[in-house]
Regions:
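Contiguous N-terminal and early-domain "leader" segments and peripheral loops that mark the onset or edge
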Residues: 24, 43, 139-140
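N- or domain-start disorder-to-order transition segments that initiate the globular core
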Residues: 2-34
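M16/MPP (pitrilysin/insulinase) zinc-metallopeptidase core fold and M16-derived inactive scaffolds
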Residues: 31, 36-103, 124
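Acidic/histidine-enriched segments that form metal/cofactor-coordinating
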Residues: 74-153
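A short linear-motif detector with a strong N-terminal bias
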Residues: 3-5, 15-20, 41, 64-66, ...
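Short glycine-rich loop/turn motifs
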Residues: 22, 36, 150-153
Length: 153
């Protein structure tokens, strides 16, 4: 039987508060050579204004489509080159981010995430490409009987 100390819990989570108020929780597992980074930003679809429905989802998706220092290709080549993954998506109350990499590539993962959130570029060609993808997805949803019925009830 495993001892209670072997299970993750509050006893092995370290809490850091950055000067800007961001709270970081860390649980080390030295037996694993990879890291997982997850978090939320107070920017969900609930904050989409009238006539702007879908804006939070669109922006969350656009964040990894280009920054002031990296274009779409450079971001994804960096991720692929290190075997890392990074994603952002908007929920009702929050926009979440999640990433994973080898522990040695954590600085790159954090740098890419910070660049996406702090210095987004919203390149025109990516906006148009994503807009087309969103419109296609909406058209497909409207053909889905289960989706349409779920909206009615």
């Amino acid at each position: 039987m495993m001892g209670m100390m072997a299970l993750p819990g509050s006893h092995d989570i370290v809490r850091h508060v950055l000067p800007n108020g961001i709270v970081i929780l860390v649980r080390e597992n030295p037996e694993v050579a990879s890291v997982v980074v997850q978090g939320v930003l107070d920017a969900g679809t609930l904050y989409d204004g009238p006539g702007q429905e879908g804006l939070a989802s669109f922006v969350a998706t656009m964040l990894l489509r280009g920054t002031q220092t990296r274009d779409f290709q450079a971001i994804h080549e960096s991720l692929e080159g290190s075997g890392a993954a990074l994603g952002l998506s908007a929920g009702l109350h929050y926009t979440g981010f999640s990433g994973r990499s080898l522990a040695e590539d954590l600085p790159l993962l954090v740098e890419l995430l910070a660049d996406a959130v702090r210095r987004p570029a919203f390149p025109d060609e990516q906006i148009e490409r994503l807009r087309g993808q969103f419109v296609t997805a909406l058209k497909i949803q409207e053909q889905d009987t289960r989706y349409v019925a779920g909206r009615m009830f």
